[in-house]
Amino acid sequence: MSHANNPVVEIRAAVKHYRTPEGHAVRALDGVDLSVGANEFVTLLGPSGCGKTTLLRTISGFESLDSGELLIQGVAMNQVPPNRRPVHTVFQSYALFPHLSIGDNVGYALDVRGVARAERRQRVGAALELVGMGGLEKRKPGQLSGGQQQRVALARAIVDRPALLLLDEPLSALDRQLRQAMQRELKNLQHELGIAFVFVTHDQEEALTMSDRIVVLNGGHVQQVGAPQDIYDRPANAFVAGFIGESNLLRARVESCADGVATLVGEQGDPLRLPSAGLQVGQPLHILLRPEQFHLDCPGDPAAHGALDGVVEQTVFIGKDFEVSLRSATGSRIKAVVRDASRQALQRLHPGSSLRLWYALDAAHPIAGEA
């Protein structure tokens, strides 16, 4: 369970089943615990079918829990319908009324609640200014680009300042450049509003860029909750290590521990070295090494570094960096990202060349589990 100060949302032991067309029960949420702080940007991340959208829909009220508790601002919400929850949702499809002006789209909820005309005009204008759409109240949705329509959908969702904003893959239909711009705008908007955002995405870059905390789900279970850097650098298990970012996940077993350094032998054919804190001789592990943590030359004291040997299979230019695929003597594949390589260094990256890759001992992250 994650613990947030001053939680706006608390989910306790949430369970949700679905029935397949064949009549089989599928557990979409399996005992999920989560809390979201009042000013947090929390992202639900995981593969298709992991439960992230189901979890979002239970918070919004579009799905009900089979068991467990849901509290928003300390009030039990299990029996409260969606329209009575202090929550708004922004979807991938903008769901704007095409026959209404932008101002009327944004102010629709205020009209339903009977807000006075002068106050409505002020709040609609303020919401549109916040999303960079001020002065466009009289336009119709069909006159706007996709990015502008997304901003209008956001303005509509925040016009009455909900306690919580839910975002269900709202940027996935935008092109890459616009999506990156909207990521920055969303994060700035969340800070300015001072309300909690719960964001669903399948895009890891979005999650790592925007979130205060990330919730990684798989098979209806929470695998890990943490800050983006913790999730990336210190994954809790092999699933998170393999799912988040590019990774080399090497199976190994601790052979010896001496002078604060553990030596492991694994399927990659070379001895692996890493700090021995918390490790025991004979212990099976997965060792995580990110591709960008390798160096062509030892950058410091060799005693503080480990090395992997292999033969270059492929080198691919990816902008200013080179992605190198290495195969060890035992057949294991290692992926490395080489940065700022000199012309002389590039000669060592030709396919068929023998290559030694260096890494700092503390860059290797051990993960408990059968090797």
Q: Which residues fall in each region the model found?
A:
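Conserved ABC transporter NBD signature motif
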Residues: G68-A76
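ABC ATPase nucleotide-binding domains
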Residues: P82-G242
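Non-catalytic connector elements of ABC transporters
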Residues: S247, C257-A371
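Helix-to-loop junction immediately C-terminal to a conserved catalytic motif
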Residues: S60
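The feature captures the beta-strand-to-loop junction immediately N-terminal to the Walker
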Residues: L45-P47
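Pre-Walker A (P-loop) beta-loop-beta motif of ABC nucleotide-binding domains
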Residues: V32-T43, F97
